[in-house]
Structures are given as structure tokens and as C-alpha cells.
Amino acid sequence: MKKIIVIGCPGSGKTTFAEKLRDRTGLPLYYLDAIWHKPDRTHISREEYDERLSEILACDSYIIDGNYSRTLEERLKACDTVFLFDLPLEVCLEGAISRLGKARYDVPWIDTELDPDFRREIEGFGEKNLPRIYELLRKHKDGKRIVIFKSRKEADGFIEGLE
């Protein structure tokens, strides 16, 4: 467990889990949102993002937090461990709302309200994204440890079980 990706619906607890995993393992943590977004709410080019992601994937160890479906298959091919947060919609919406007004490491600004487009992304994640994620997990399962969390309690239990 040295090349880890943490994926799942926004608001599901991915980042909190990734930070706890980093603290427990000492592995470097990379936030895809922090790579993609600039402080002015614009983003870097796809080429620059791809270059930075390739540099991370070439490392001996990492934890990568985030979805970015365009590059998910590349990350799945490179990693040895996947943590998927497949939590109920209500939990994810509550998670996204609970972080409003708070500074975060993964985005360079503070949201004070839930953006309607972001809310739609969360609401559509189960129908739009999860089927493809599960398909890619089946395709790239060989030689990988895949852990699927259905609750934050399961994720916390996993962290507590690490030595």
C-alpha cells in the first residue's frame, strides 16, 4: 500500500480520510483539486495538469485524493490500492454543506454557499459516475487492493485498524 488513490462522490469524506491515511502512513498526499484550480477560480491547462499528474504517478509512493474522471483510468493503472467512497447521496450533500465557510487545503478559496452546478454534480454522481468507476475497478482489479466504504464509520474503522 504505497500508491493509493481515494475516489468517490464530493462530500463523501475522501479528503478527511486521505488526510488521516497520510498522518497514519507518512505517505505524501496530493489533492487533484489543488493541482487543477488556481486561487482566482480558473484552472490550469489540461496539458499542465496531465504533466503534474504524470510526475506524481512516477513517484514511489503517494496518496491521490480526487476524482477527475478523465484521468481515472491512468491513476487506476498506476496505483496498488483504491479506496472508493460509495455513500448515500444525503450523506454527501450534508458533507459538502458542512464544509461551507471553512478553509480547506484542497481548494484555494472558501465557499460560502453550495454552487448549483456542484450540487448537481453531487446529485448525479451515483447515476453518472459510479457505474463507470465500478467498471474501471473490475477492469483494473488485478494486483490491486480495492476497498469500498459504504459509510464514514467503515472508513474510520479502517484507519483505526492501521498500525
List each language-model region with its residue ranges.
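Hydrophobic anchor at the beta1->P-loop junction of P-loop NTPases
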Residues: 6
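P-loop (Walker A) phosphate-binding loop of NTP-binding proteins
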Residues: 9
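ATP-binding Walker
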Residues: 12
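Walker A/P-loop
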Residues: 15
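NTP-dependent small-molecule kinase module
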Residues: 24, 124-163
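Conserved nucleotide-sensing/catalytic segment adjacent to the nucleotide-binding pocket
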Residues: 28-82
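A glycine- and Lys/Arg-enriched "phosphate-lid" helix/loop adjacent to the NTP-binding pocket
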Residues: 87-132
